[in-house]
Amino acid sequence: MTTITTAQIKSTLQSAKQSAANKLHSAGQSTKDALKKAAEQTRNAGNRLILLIPKDYKGQGSSLNDLVRTADELGIEVQYDEKNGTAITKQVFGTAEKLIGLTERGVTIFAPQLDKLLQKYQKAGNILGGGAENIGDNLGKAGGILSTFQNFLGTALSSMKIDELIKKQKSGGNVSSSELAKASIELINQLVDTVASLNNNVNSFSQQLNTLGSVLSNTKHLNGVGNKLQNLPNLDNIGAGLDTVSGILSAISASFILSNADADTRTKAAAGVELTTKVLGNVGKGISQYIIAQRAAQGLSTSAAAAGLIASAVTLAISPLSFLSIADKFKRANKIEEYSQRFKKLGYDGDSLLAAFHKETGAIDASLTTISTVLASVSSGISAAATTSLVGAPVSALVGAVTGIISGILEASKQAMFEHVASKMADVIAEWEKKHGKNYFENGYDARHAAFLEDNFKILSQYNKEYSVERSVLITQQHWDTLIGELAGVTRNGDKTLSGKSYIDYYEEGKRLEKKXDEFQKQVFDPLKGNIDLSDSKSSTLLKFVTPLLTPGEEIRERRQSGKYEYITELLVKGVDKWTVKGVQDKGAVYDYSNLIQHASVGNNQYREIRIESHLGDGDDKVFLSAGSANIYAGKGHDVVYYDKTDTGYLTIDGTKATEAGNYTVTRVLGGDVKVLQEVVKEQEVSVGKRTEKTQYRSYEFTHINGKNLTETDNLYSVEELIGTTRADKFFGSKFTDIFHGADGDDLIEGNDGNDRLYGDKGNDTLSGGNGDDQLYGGDGNDKLIGVAGNNYLNGGDGDDEFQVQGNSLAKNVLFGGKGNDKLYGSEGADLLDGGEGDDLLKGGYGNDIYRYLSGYGHHIIDDDGGKEDKLSLADIDFRDVAFKREGNDLIMYKGEGNVLSIGHKNGITFRNWFEKESGDISNHEIEQIFDKSGRIITPDSLKKALEYQQRNNKASYVYGNDALAYGSQGDLNPLINEISKIISAAGSFDVKEERTAASLLQLSGNASDFSYGRNSITLTTSA
């Protein structure tokens, strides 16, 4: 390699000037004029561009000679510094890697770094695209680079001048339209200079154009260009993205500048063709189209291309909305790319592919939109210039024609560019499917499901504990994914995509079980045929549909053209009308069908119904049903069916015709106010330029049945217990034992024959046991509980409840009021009545009844009609805490509260008609024995004597309970406890050996009183 010294360069500088001048002259008058004008404008702007050569620098090859010669010809000052290169870089550039620096002398180009760049220039040129590798054919490599630097500097300065004028005008300064027009023309000239210095070889660019010559052939002044553009390759074969845009724009620019021999420099400038190089693709995409579009969208000027014009007053009717939409495309592409990172790790790169599509088409869109905007700006600028006679009218007319042609070319090319990018993405998908032998979009759903399992592991792994089983079998539906659907539409693969995919996963002991080939011998889940088989399971199992599962069947898709640019992929479902479930055979299981979609809309408010047929095993099973019909064959064990986990309509359960225990027909009306899961067909529309793709897919809605009433029918076999809905349900029991739960709502529950257990739960319910020994539980709400024939246990729960028992003298009934103001009506038999908390009415009837009262209860009224052995247990009260007083025919018992016993405040018991003795009245309203917690007894006779004694000797109308004792001790409680146990045992078939809540509630308390006594030591007050 030859080494050249600074001295040698100085000695040959004079001859180099002449050589460079000749070379510049041969480049063409247009280029020479442009470059000289650029140099002049740079100097006029008051800035100097300097090529700085340190004294110790030795150039390589002949490139330094070229630098010096061309710099001199271009008017760039060459300076030699006495300092060495290291000192200069430290002082001016800060680092030896920088090419350009700013000093007090001016903008400085560091020769050693530029020389290094020249050695790599050929390689760089090949990368830049278009005809960039031919840059500098007439001026040399050095001239191309230096003139580019110079013209960029001039462009920046010209743009700044426009910015200053615009800012001045916005702030109220006096700026005329002619000043703006002149500044615009100056900027246009600068851009033309840049184009001319780079794109002076038309042959290298014209080969890239599409067959657009026919459009231009008949245009005046441009027929030469049109002829040159005939018979060129199709645009679909040109590279995608910015390379495509750059190639087209470079070719158009070079052709218009150099092919029209009759056009002078001013005409070329007025035409504004060179402004199409705004995207600067042929200088390595040095200025980002995205940044330009964003700045323009924000109303800001830039120093790149003609972006300053966008914000200027001469721009007419330029809408920023187009730029905003482009900016949004890039934002969305970035979000999709960010979203894609997780799924790449899970084996799916479709999201990244979609992001790349939006970035490439967004770049094309940004470029073409920006160019169209600039062309409109140029036309406006030239028109403004024409009004001030800066250019002639013919030039102004030519501008409109040329810019219109270019806009048409770009618009015609846009769709082809978009489709080329889409085809690239489609090729990637096809290649992946060929390699892996699998549907690409199905793989996307697999990745989505893997992420779902990761995100929800804590919930999924705890289901077995929640449902008290050993194993959870969880079926999950991954529903339609809009990004997957969008990619399918973009790549014309709508017929290959899926509405989603369903999965089955297994969990035990908080861990997910991997599906091994030898672990699960048969296909457990077949969503195409609608089969689920758990018969091989050896563990207690939960079958749960975690997300709404689409109806079983096969999807068939067909993509067809529906318009010039419109396509639709239509969906046909070859559905199966039944889910068949084989349950766990020897262990208890839970089957949660509440998320199973059983209604599919097929158009015109018509519905297809999918039934559930469930064959359970011999364990104790639980079944949660959905809104559709079902056949449940429960098998052995104690099996429970639930209707309350989702909206299952208005429920009627009928066992009146059953010939075997556990058989019921369940009718459900899905009225207009009932919301159910419905499968529907929806469409996603995707646009690729002018092309639109509609893809149909299955989804679901939780919605009303459009004002119509649908009736569903369930057939239940060998089901021991039923739980109703949240609505007002009707239950009609069989002649066998029925166990019904009303759940929420105001329910009507009739047990009919058999020993039934009826639960009203929430709501104002009516429960009737019918014949048999029944147990009725009202639950929350104001309930009515009716015990008919047999021995009945009635528990009202919370609320103001009413109890009725209708048995004969042999009947034994338990009536427990619970909280609230209750009314308890006994039968002719022996009844146990406990009003519970609240102010209650207790009417035992004609039998020998037992009443129970605790200190925490409210004011009770006992209206006993008969019986010669009625008893009252004051289970946790001592007689020293009460007093008795006669009021008319009633006997009032007052109890102490807070060590105060207040006569006149009815807080204990009123014994209605205790003293009533009418002629011929066989009724007996007295309670024959009143027990306190210690077993001491007051009888009607002992109470009568005590009251008479107090009235006679103390002139008092009341008597302490302790002064009315007849007899009794702790041992006298045993017979009472035995009687209570017999009634409880008979009522509702309670086994007294078992720990029954109801029985334990009715046991008598043997605890000591909370009060501390002397004899009648509590404070006694009287009140009116």
UniProtKB/Swiss-Prot annotation:
InterPro entries: Hemolysin-typ_Ca-bd_CS, Hemolysn_Ca-bd, RTX_C, RTX_pore_form, RTX_toxin/Mannuronan_C5-epim, RTX_toxin_determinant-A, Serralysin-like_metalloprot_C. The Gly-rich region is probably involved in binding calcium, which is required for target cell-binding or cytolytic activity. A lipid is attached at K564, K690 (N6-myristoyl lysine). The chain crosses the membrane at residues 238-260, 268-327, 365-411. It is found in: Secreted; Host cell membrane. GO terms for cellular component: extracellular region; host cell plasma membrane; membrane. Residues 20-39 are annotated as: Disordered. Changing K564 to R/A/C: Abolished acylation by HlyC and subsequent activation. Its main location: secreted. Hemolysin-type calcium-binding repeats lie at residues 732-749, 750-767, 768-785, 786-803, 816-833, 834-851. This is Hemolysin, plasmid.
